[in-house]
Amino acid sequence: MQKILHINPDKCTGCLQCEMACSFENYGTFATAKSRIKVFDFHETGKKVPYTCTQCDEAWCMHACPVEAIKHDKVTGAMVVNETTCVGCKVCTIACPFGTINYVQETGKVQKCDLCGGDPACASACPTGAITFVDANWTGLDKMKQWADKLGNQPSAA
């Protein structure tokens, strides 16, 4: 069964454990600059919001890549960059409407979240549960039904 990263910004404290875990998992070093997940800080409101590749169905990055270096991993559901095939042209970074593919200066290639092969380090490291790895079929409709069941039948406001 496919799983996805679910991010609940209301639970994020901005501790950056997700960024540290990601960089260590992928590069063996604790460096937020090398993380494939980022925590955006909305200074005006004090809100912290983790964001990374959503592994979207449209996969604009994959379709834009002129050398087909991005492939869909059928096991994890992730769009994965083949670093051997990638030529570093950055077309995928332009195609991604979410800005979650990054060019890595040291390698001359791009990087993006690959769900750590099915066991995302960011979700495991998150101390507040702001990042979880959940069943992909648990959709918004399922959440609404769950809330409705919790609330029971309420009288209408007629």
Label the model's feature ranges.
Residues 1-7:
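N-terminal beta-strand motif that seeds the catalytic metal site of vicinal oxygen chelate
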Residues 2, 31-67, 83-158:
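Flanking helices and flexible, charged tails adjoining ferredoxin-like Fe-S electron-transfer domains
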Residues 10-30, 35-42:
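A positional/architectural concept
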